[in-house]
Amino acid sequence: SQADCQRFGCGYAPQGWDNLVRYLAGKGFTQQEMLDAGLARQGQHGVYDYFRGRVTWPIRDSTGRALGFGARKLYEDDSIGAKYINTPDTALYRKNQVLYGIDMAKAAIVKKRQVVIVEGYTDVMAMHLAGVDTAIATCGTAFGAEHAKIVRRLIADDSLGAVQLIGPLKVCLLYTS
């Protein structure tokens, strides 16, 4: 529904080479800023939109600050073969240090001291819509040590809890790589 799309920040990056580049330039952003943010790429004929013809989702930190975007391919003629793409690593966004949905799930994770880790953006959306408000996902990478640290900080509210959590997280890491 439209309300669900707003809740999750779903968007659409239209087809075309430079829709976003032209829009942001009109707002005073430089091409270098667009490149640095991972929103554009440098091609043989100039700067072009990285996300084109895709459904998009903002990837936020635990405070709700947008760090980057994830996007799903909609059209078969997409020049990027990958079904899903993310903002490339930037000064703000490092996929091995970000969990999609953490902004929506943080309060529930802290309160319930549990987390459900799923595969991707749409899985997080489906889980939240089904009432599983502790669902989060990695952003196109295996669940790693940095992700475990984020989860540990939310679940373990004391040093004993942190120690008790390390063992299960180590086991999880063995089966995610």
Specify the residue positions occupied by each region the protein language model found.
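Phosphate/diphosphate-binding loops
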Residues: 171
